[in-house]
Amino acid sequence: MAELEHLGGKRAESARARRAEQLRRWRGSLTEQEPAERQGAGRQLQTRRGSPRVRFEDGAVFLAACSSGDTDEVKKLLARGADINTVNVDGLTALHQACIDENLDMVKFLVENRANVNQQDNEGWTPLHAAASCGYLNIAEYFISHGASVGIVNSEGEVPSDLAEEPAMKDLLLEQVKKQGVDLEQSRKEEEQQMLQDARQWLNSGRIEDVRQARSGATALHVAAAKGYSEVLRLLIQAGYELNVQDHDGWTPLHAAAHWGVKEACSILAEALCDMDIRNKLGQTPFDVADEGLVEHLEMLQKKQDVLRSEKETRNKLIESDLNSKFQSGLFKNKEKMLYEEEIPKSQDTEEENKESSSSSSEEEEGEDEVSESETEKEADKKPEATVNHSNSEIKSRIMEQIPAPAQNTFSASSARRLSSLFNKAEEPKDESPSSWRLGLRKTGSHNMLSEVANSREALRDRGSSIYRSSSSPRISALLDDKDKERENKSYFSMLVPRRLSSTSDIEEKENRESAVNLVRSGSHTRQLWRDEAKGSETPQTIAPSTYTSTYLKRTPYKSQADSTAEKTADSVSSSTPLCVITNRPAPSTANGVPAATVFSSAGTDPSVEAREKRRSYLTPVRDEEAESLRKARSRQARQTRRSTQGVTLTDLQEAEKTFSRSRAERQAQEQPGEKLEDPGGLEGSTKKQEPSAAPTKGAGEGRSLEEEPIYHRLRYPTQPDKPTTPVSPSASRPSLYTGSHLLRTSRASGPDSENSETSTHATAAKEMDTSEKGEADLDDQSSNRLSVRERRRAKDRRRGTGINFWTNDEDETDVSEEVKEALHERLSRLESGGTNPTSSDSYSDRASARARREAREARLASLTSRVEEDSNRDYKKLYESALTENQKLKTKLQEAQLELADIKAKLEKMAQQKQEKTSDRSSVLEVEKRERRALERKMSEMEEEMKVLTELKSDNQRLKDENGALIRVISKLSK
């Protein structure tokens, strides 16, 4: 009690101290210092005016009455004109509030008094959204029965069914969605589609007609950034929308995108160089209001924006300095950029119309001959030049002044467009190569405009028009004026052609240097122009070298000749001839037997042809696949002719046989001096016949390159001490071989008429038979070698060809065997006719030996023919298919073996892993056992100690019991 009284005294003392502190503050206040009269007057004035009254707005009174459920007060307010759909600061109506409060009676009262059931608040929520979120099923059914929409989307793109959590509510809403046929995806994208349509309309019209939201001041850019409409955002930025536009709170689109966590919108705005440090009215930057997971991304975007801004500033400085230097140096200084005012008579107005109609096509052409070009240059020199100022505005105004009335128009539509495009562009460098600006003007010609352009071009030719241009081609009269440049180009080209006529790039460089006025065209137009030039040409000789294929080849240089005049002719030809183009037909010079050098020299001496070739606009050389395959095939043929292990074809065999017979005839003629004396013109005639045949061969070999011949054969003649072995082409060697066989026949025919003895004739026949046996042995070896080579090369013929197909003599084996038989029978008959001379007196033994040799030869011939038939009857296709099937079987076996090997490896790895796991498990088990054993041993020792203590305790306990008993006895005795 004393303590309670003490505590109560302490509280009283603290209360008195607080009151004293209040009084002290009051004494120091301004109110206490005022005079008492003034305080009393103030109180009297306040009581006279009455207490102050607080007045609320009608909307707030209406919402308060609805919240309290006072229907009578609500009716009075509605009668006085209150809005039933009035909203509070958050956009909530009385119906929203009644739905949230689950006041079904007030909901029915408001709906019956025509409250809007689809009214949205500031977040886009309708009363049905609220009912679905709260799970009020009866209110939701009532809303749906009175026309509430289940497809309205709130600000976050959610429909009422998305907010429903209870299964019954979700089923009800989804059933109504199906019943009303509402497309929820379309409803979610409706706002974005509408904004996308408006943004495209603003972009196309060039005028942005956006209306800010009255409540928040938000723009379309704010909405697109906050909701992540990326496409709308890009279109609005492209239309020129202000990136840093602010709403009523000072928020920019970047604030909205950062606050709602839209990363893509932040990236788009930052890359468009928006202000990332701008502050709203509360002093917050986008970093301050951003979502926590987006701050690092914004910092990275700010660094990237700094880099982009510095690059843009550097680019702008370069552009400004470039423009300033160009304006200071003056525009269009050189003669190539000067404007010429064309003066054309009224009689040529129709020609100008034709030029206008054809100027829109994609062809760029030049004049037909140098006469028209020189006339154009003279007219351009005589025409007055328009004065050009450095200012673009003055230039354009002067051009407009110089353009006369439409009736006396001196410019075509294409030239006017050309002039306007010249002023809008920056000045091009002076020393630009022709190839660079020509490549910039390359266009693809329209195929259906070809005939129309060709007709207009012929009409312009007939009327004497000078140059035929396209709307995009620059004026090149100044280039034609520059005679020095033209001479340098011509001299350079004349030096360049003999050395560099091989590659496609050299051809392109030649065309660029030679014809600077030519413009690049498509292939179809080029062919059409060549046909037109061929039709209108007056010299038909120049059409022969030109073809319509674009396969350019290297031309081999001429061989050195003894005549100096021929060397000069070859040099002049190589510097003036155009490129050689392959055709499938032989050249006229080679077909007629005339050397190619003569034709080239005649073509090179024509000056009109040279001018035509220099002015002609060729198609830009393109790598031709056919030319590539042709080159590969020919190089393969050349490699085959160089190999020492190549096969001997039937043609080689026939040529060797005829050459061998010719050499044998020469030896026979040498052994018969009397026959030589009687007929000294035999061999001379044959050699005379051989020399003319060898001459055109040499000429053809020099005039024609190795690549122009379809098939190459290199013959190997028997080595002779007095006659070197030379390669002869088949077309050139056949006449000489025919003359050789003719010489043999004439020598044989002159044999019976000679005055030699029978013994010499018999010896000659015997030698001839011996040599024929050797030749037949060689023939057998060659034929067997040829057949084995054909077997080896058969697989190559079965391959798919990638280039031009070459015909070989190996394709028909039946014909080969028949030709071999005929050749062998012919030789046997010749030998028999030569050996059995009726005038000779040979012995019976000689005839028997000859018969034996003949039978041996027939046996060899039969074996050879049987071998040929076996080779011809062999089906290589079946062999190839069998090899393929065997190869496939081996592949499958290999795959199976590989699979088995992989399985075995996997099993081995698994077993090794299991073994390792077992060993590791065993070691771990051993460790555990060791630990348990140690623990048990420790426990045993502890238990032993406890047992010792227990025994001691038992002994102590017993001792204490004994003492206790003794004490009890003592006490009992004392008590007695």
Curated annotation (Swiss-Prot):
ANK repeat placement: 57-86, 90-119, 123-152, 216-245, 249-278
This protein's record includes keyword Chaperone: no
Modification type Phosphothreonine: residues: 444, 645, 802
Region (Disordered): 1-52, 342-489, 503-873
PROSITE patterns the record matches: ANK_REP_REGION (PS50297), ANK_REPEAT (PS50088)
Biased composition (Acidic residues): 362-374
SUPFAM superfamilies xref list: Ankyrin repeat
One example GO MF annotation: protein kinase binding
Compartment(s) of residence: Cytoplasm, Cytoskeleton; Cytoplasm, Cytoskeleton, Stress fiber
Pfam families membership: Ank_2 (PF12796), PRKG1_interact (PF15898)
Ranges of biased composition (kind: Basic residues): 632-642, 791-801
Main location group: cytoplasm
UniProt feature, compositional bias: Low complexity: 411-423, 465-477
Keywords, alphabetical: ANK repeat, Cytoplasm, Cytoskeleton, Phosphoprotein, Repeat
Phosphoserine found at: 29, 502, 833, 941
GO cellular component: A band; stress fiber; Z disc
CDD domains: IPD_MYPT1
GO biological process, one term: signal transduction
Compositional bias ranges of the Basic and acidic residues kind: 1-24, 375-385, 480-489, 622-631, 655-679, 765-777, 818-830, 844-860
Compositionally biased tracts (Polar residues): 538-564, 722-739, 747-763
Subunit structure as annotated in this protein's UniProt entry: PP1 comprises a catalytic subunit, PPP1CA, PPP1CB or PPP1CC, and one or several targeting or regulatory subunits. PPP1R12B mediates binding to myosin. Isoform 3 and isoform 4 bind PPP1R12A, but not isoform 1 of PPP1R12B itself. Binds IL16.
The protein's role, per its UniProt record: Regulates myosin phosphatase activity. Augments Ca(2+) sensitivity of the contractile apparatus.
Annotated protein name in UniProt: Protein phosphatase 1 regulatory subunit 12B
Organism: Mus musculus (Mouse)
Gene name as annotated: Ppp1r12b
